[in-house]
């Protein structure tokens, strides 16, 4: 049986999905989140993944997945097809940020986005020490990272305001996966948002 990756943001996302809802996971990797949503929530899950290894791993988990590049949009999906469109730890890797967020809310009633917070105090400390941060949420060295963008909670919320997106809920986690309520832009390592129009 294929292993399922456990992540704290998956716990939050799973809590937001109601039984039987339709979920599209963009950049689904090996399909671990979708597998969990299908098994625990009875969701109808579909994935889009660029990397062949991820597609094959998702197929091995019996996930409905297509190989595709998010940068080319979601033209293959009709408007409002899904209850939730998830972009988990992937937004920082896309070039056309505004377009993908708009597409998510075209094909889904709600967008769920998680990303590493570059303003987390340990990341700031690394940069102040003259080094790019490497952590569980930012696991790559500067020379091999797929990340194109390094942004903070405040940056993301400014973008949401510019795009007239409604932040329905925001949860921020520390490196241990615990909820952060005080000074989240400073103490939070990973942010998870529910967005609507």
Feature locations, PLM:
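Class I SAM-dependent methyltransferase "Motif I" SAM/SAH-binding loop
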Residues: 27-29
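S-adenosyl-L-methionine-dependent methyltransferase catalytic module, highlighting the catalytic core
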Residues: 98-103, 110-197
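Glycine-rich SAM-binding Motif I of class I
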Residues: 31-35
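A short SAM/SAH-binding and catalytic strip from SAM-dependent methyltransferases
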Residues: 84-95
